[in-house]
Amino acid sequence: MIDPKLLRGDLTDLQQQLATRGYTLDIAFWQNIENERKSLQVKTEELQSRRNTGAKQVGVLKKSGEDASELLAEMQSVSGEIKTAEDELRTLQERISQAAMQIPNIPAADVPVGTSEDDNVEVRKWGTPREFDFEIKDHTHIGETLGMLDFEAATKLTGSRFNVLKGQLAQMHRALIQFMLNTHTIKYGYTETYVPYIVNSESLKGTGQLPKFEDDLFKLTNHTNNDDMDFYLIPTAEVPMTNLVRGERLDIKELPLKFTAHTPCFRSEAGSHGRDTRGLIRQHQFEKVEMVNIATAEQSDELLEAMTGQAEFILQQLNLPYRTVKLCTGDMGFAAQKTYDIEVWLPSQETYREISSCSNCGDFQARRMGTRVKDGKQTSLAHTLNGSGLAVGRTLLAVMENHQNADGSITIPEVLRPFMGGADIILL
C-alpha cells in the first residue's frame, strides 16, 4: 500500500505517476473522503474536549458540594455522541484503507515510462543462440517423442494446462530444483525454507494479491457445506516467505534476511485465455524456486541488482542464452516499484520468453504487513524484494530446446549430471 499521507495532499503529481501504470486516480473521490475524514476527526476531538472540560467542572461542583446531576447527564449524552463519532470515523477509515488497497505501487524514478512489454528496455544479453544444422523441434514434440511428457494423461487426470513428466525428464526437473536451491543457499547464503502451499487471505493482502486479483487465485471451499474458507493455494512462494515477517519488528543488524524455497505454484490464468495453450509455458500448476529479501530502504536497490544477477547465474551455468530487461511502468506487477525480467532464448519460437521476474517492492508490502525495522529507538518500514530463481518448468523446456540433438536426444547440462546419476544424455 502506498503511503496514506500521499492521498491527503496535492494529488496531481500522484495522479500523473500512477497514470503511467495505467491506473486512474479519482482525485474527486479522495478529496471528498479526506474532507469527510477531517470533519469527523474535528467533530470527535471537539466532543472529547467537551467531555474533558465537563469532567473537570463536575469535579469542581462535587468538591464545593453543589448539584452536578444535570452536568453528569449532559456528559453521558456527550459520551454517547463520542462513541457514535468514533464508530463513524472507524468505518470511514476502513473505507479509505480498502480503497487504498486498490492502488498500485509508485514506480521508481529510473523506471522507463511505457504501456506494454514493447516499451521495456533491454539491459544486457548473455550467450549466443545456437545455430542448428537440423530442423528445430519444440519442447512438446521432443518430450512426447521421448515418451516422457504426457499432456493427454494430465488432461484425463485433471484438465487442460497440466502435465505429467516421466523418466529422465522428471529426474531433470528434480535436478534443476536441487541445483537452484544449492546455488542460492551455498553460493549466495540464502536460508532455505519449507512453507505451506495454502495461505490465508491476510497473507495475500500483505503481498498485494488481494483484494485486487482474487480471480487469479484458487480458493478452497469446505466440501461439507460449500462455505468459503479463508484459504487459498499459493500463486508463488513469495506470499508465504514474505509474510514470515508480517507484524514483526526486525533488528537492523539482522538485515538483510534472505529466504529461498521450492514450491508448486497455482494460478487460474484467468486473463490468458487462448495464450500459450500448447506446452509448458503457461500451466495452472508449476514449480518455482523463489528468492525473497527483507531489507532496509538503503539496502534494497543494491539487493535488486544482486538478486537479478543470482537468477542470471543459474542460466549461465546451464548455458542458456538470455536477455535482461527493465520493465516499463505499464508492464510491472501491482506491488513492484522496479522490476527486471530475465528472458531465456527459445529456439522453436526464435524469441526470448520470461523465465524470471525480480522486483523491489520498496515499503509497499511492508506497510500492508506492518513490518518495521528497529534502529535503536527509531523504527521505519522494511523494504521487500522477490525474484524467481527460477521457474522450473520453463527452465526445463529451455534446456530441452537449446540442448536438443538431431536424433531427438537431449544433452544434459554438466551442472545437472551429479543430480542425475552421472548421465550426460537423455536418449530415445
UniProtKB/Swiss-Prot annotation:
Root EC class: ligase
Listed GO CC annotations: cytoplasm
Biological process according to GO: selenocysteine biosynthetic process; seryl-tRNA aminoacylation
SUPFAM superfamilies on file: Class II aaRS and biotin synthetases, tRNA-binding arm
Compartmental location: Cytoplasm
Binding of ATP, residues: 267-269, 354-357
Pathway where this protein functions: Aminoacyl-tRNA biosynthesis; selenocysteinyl-tRNA(Sec) biosynthesis; L-seryl-tRNA(Sec) from L-serine and tRNA(Sec): step 1/1
Principal place of residence: cytoplasm
Binding site for L-serine: 236-238, 290, 388
Role played: Catalyzes the attachment of serine to tRNA(Ser). Is also able to aminoacylate tRNA(Sec) with serine, to form the misacylated tRNA L-seryl-tRNA(Sec), which will be further converted into selenocysteinyl-tRNA(Sec).
PANTHER family: SERINE--TRNA LIGASE (PTHR43697:SF1), SERYL-TRNA SYNTHETASE (PTHR43697)
HAMAP family, alphabetized: Ser_tRNA_synth_type1 (MF_00176)
Recorded domain comment: Consists of two distinct domains, a catalytic core and a N-terminal extension that is involved in tRNA binding.
Name the record gives this protein: Serine--tRNA ligase
Organism: Psychrobacter cryohalolentis (strain ATCC BAA-1226 / DSM 17306 / VKM B-2378 / K5)
